[in-house]
Curated annotation (Swiss-Prot):
SUPFAM superfamilies from the UniProt entry: Multiheme cytochromes
Protein name per its UniProtKB record: Uncharacterized protein AF_0456
Membrane topology: Single-pass membrane protein
Chain ranges passing through the membrane: 45-67
Location(s), subcellular: Membrane
Source species: Archaeoglobus fulgidus (strain ATCC 49558 / DSM 4304 / JCM 9628 / NBRC 100126 / VC-16)
GO cellular component: membrane
Taxonomic lineage of the native organism: Archaea, Methanobacteriati, Methanobacteriota, Archaeoglobi, Archaeoglobales
Keyword Signal: yes
UniProt signal peptide: 1-32
UniProt KW keywords: Membrane, Signal, Transmembrane, Transmembrane helix
């Protein structure tokens, strides 16, 4: 099975288990990208679901994607502590994450949970299905964006 398809399926599995979009995208991507996370690191994502704890702001699936992309990009760039200028040190991460953000918005219409899920409904079958599509798409966008960095 193709890596992206496997990661997308894993994100849906996690979403069904947890009902947490941020956790699902973050953990599925970390697994696909061979980023080790302990339970505390995984649990860090929980409060970002529902657009930051149900507030409707930045989509949790997008948050999880940006967090995983940041970890992966920093890992692939190696030690950059000697670069004194923080902007220069982190610019490749900013650029990669900005690209993921733009693609997510292009495909979903908004980065905000409140727009993607106007009633902040995490219960109905219809909305859960929509969230599954959004989480799966976020994982696919992220892996596609990062594929050129893989070693």
């Amino acid at each position: 099975m193709e890596e992206a398809e496997k990661a997308k399926r894993r994100s849906i599995e996690l979403l069904n288990e947890t009902r947490n979009c941020a956790y699902s995208s973050f953990v599925a991507l970390a697994e696909a990208l061979n980023i080790s996370l302990n339970e505390d690191m995984k649990n860090m994502a929980i409060g970002f679901a529902g657009g930051i704890s149900g507030s409707g702001h930045i989509c949790g699936a997008l948050w999880g994607s940006i967090a995983a992309a940041s970890l992966y990009t920093m890992k692939m760039m190696g030690d950059r502590r000697k670069i004194q200028n923080p902007l220069e040190r982190y610019m490749p991460v900013y650029a990669k994450c900005a690209g993921i953000y733009r693609k997510f918005v292009e495909l979903n219409g908004s980065p905000n949970c409140g727009d993607l899920n106007p009633n902040l409904d995490l219960v109905s079958v219809e909305q859960r299905r929509k969230c599954m599509e959004i989480v799966s798409r976020a994982v696919e966008i992220t892996l596609s964006s990062l594929k050129d960095q893989k070693t």
